C-alpha cells in the first residue's frame, strides 16, 4: 500500500471537468490504491466518485449502478469483476474506533479505497 507517495491536487470547478478527470483516474487506479478527497460540503466529492465507479463499470463491461454517498452507512462496497471498491465517507465519524469496528484498513491492499473527509485519518497518523 502506498500512502502519500504520489499525492496530486486537482481543483475541479465544473462538473464536465469532474467527469473528464474521473475518466483518466479510472485508467490509472488499481488494487491497493487509496484516494482521499478533500473539499467543503457540496463541492463534488461524491459526484467524482460516482463518475469514477461508473467509468470502471463501463470499462469492465459490468452494469452501471447507482452510486450514493455513504454518509450514514460510512462505507459502500462495489464489486466490479474481481475488483472490490470501498467508498468511505468519514464526515460523521468521531473517532478511529468507529473505523476499526467496520474493518477499516483490513483490506486496503486487496481493494481500491475512495475516502471522503479523510482528515480523521491524518489526525490519527499525526498522533502516532
Label the predicted regions.
Residues 2-3, 56-59, 63-84, 90-128:
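Helix-rich effector regions associated with P-loop NTPase G domains
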Residues 2-24:
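N-terminal pre-Walker A segment at the start of P-loop NTPase domains
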Residues 35-37:
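Hydrophobic anchor at the beta1->P-loop junction of P-loop NTPases
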Residues 41:
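The conserved Walker
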Residues 45:
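Conserved lysine of the Walker
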Amino acid at each position: 500500500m502506498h500512502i502519500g507517495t504520489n499525492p496530486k491536487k486537482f481543483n475541479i470547478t465544473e462538473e464536465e471537468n469532474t467527469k473528464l478527470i474521473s475518466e483518466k483516474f479510472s485508467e490509472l487506479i488499481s488494487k491497493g490504491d487509496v484516494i482521499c478527497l478533500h473539499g467543503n460540503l457540496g463541492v463534488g466529492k461524491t459526484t467524482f466518485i460516482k463518475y469514477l465507479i461508473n467509468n470502471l463499470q463501463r470499462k469492465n463491461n459490468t452494469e452501471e449502478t447507482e452510486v450514493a454517498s455513504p454518509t450514514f452507512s460510512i462505507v459502500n462496497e462495489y464489486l466490479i469483476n474481481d475488483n472490490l471498491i470501498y467508498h468511505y465517507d468519514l464526515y460523521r465519524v468521531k473517532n478511529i474506533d468507529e473505523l476499526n469496528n467496520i474493518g477499516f484498513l483490513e483490506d486496503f491492499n486487496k481493494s481500491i479505497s475512495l475516502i471522503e473527509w479523510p482528515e480523521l485519518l491524518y489526525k490519527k497518523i499525526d498522533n502516532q
